[in-house]
Amino acid sequence: MTKILYGNEVALKIKEDLNLRMDKLKEKNIIPKLAILRMGNKQDDIAYERSIIKSCEKLNIETKVEELNEDILEEDFLKLMENLNNEKDIHGILVFRPYPKHLNENIINSSIALNKDVDCMHPLNLERIFEGDLDGVMPCTPEAVIEILKYYDIDLKGKNIVIINRSMVVGKPLSMMVLSNNATVTICHSKTIDLPSITKKADIVVTAIGKAKLIKEEYFNENSIIIDVSINVDENGKLCGDVDFENVKEKVGAITPVPKGVGSVTTTLLLKHIVEAAERNS
């Protein structure tokens, strides 16, 4: 019988710890605060922003939103970032991606103060992960994948893991993180030939393609553990993942649902990183 790996349970456990840590910060009159930088008015970004603000409010974390024009000059962006870096009451900074094409991603990411980077965007924080150091801040989505596997006692040691994503947001950092946990990793992407033949041999498949219900039962074996990172909208306007959940849910070992899967843990880990930043700077 297929086990459903609910992210909500993982998120709840993390929040229990965060509530205790927030109480200790309150005793010191410290209120964690997140600055959100959004360029343009994409509906997905606005929806994500609302979700973050709502989650922060529940934990009494303050937020400051900087709504920027999509054509903002790089020098103006960097001036704003410098101001936010110097604001003592701001503990975390999150910049929504992808960036407008005229902005240099490396320059933007490097402008975030290391101690206020809550999603491992700064190259130096990413470098630590590629060196096998997982003690610092980690990117929220890859960390959510790891936390779900840990919560459900899925040991990564010796496992064959296929990651269908090669971005610096998910695929590449996650590959380094599972390597540090002694797994064997294969990264696949849009140019991979005969993807089902590769995923079917894997113990764990992590997918972050961004294509609604693209992946069917022929991609898996009866013991496959599936972590579906993507949040898509299907033909009926309902949220779904890359995997056709109804098609595979009785034919694999375990699977995360969408919604109530990776996304809820990702947001909770962002809150955790904000609290940790406030603790460090207190």
UniProtKB/Swiss-Prot annotation:
The keyword Hydrolase applies. Its EC number is 1.5.1.5, 3.5.4.9. It catalyses: (6R)-5,10-methylene-5,6,7,8-tetrahydrofolate + NADP(+) = (6R)-5,10-methenyltetrahydrofolate + NADPH; (6R)-5,10-methenyltetrahydrofolate + H2O = (6R)-10-formyltetrahydrofolate + H(+). One of its GO terms (molecular function) is methenyltetrahydrofolate cyclohydrolase activity. GO terms for biological process: L-histidine biosynthetic process; methionine biosynthetic process; purine nucleotide biosynthetic process; tetrahydrofolate interconversion. Pathway: One-carbon metabolism; tetrahydrofolate interconversion. Homodimer. Belongs to the tetrahydrofolate dehydrogenase/cyclohydrolase family. Catalyzes the oxidation of 5,10-methylenetetrahydrofolate to 5,10-methenyltetrahydrofolate and then the hydrolysis of 5,10-methenyltetrahydrofolate to 10-formyltetrahydrofolate. This is Bifunctional protein FolD. The lineage of its organism: Bacteria, Bacillati, Bacillota, Clostridia, Eubacteriales. The gene is folD.
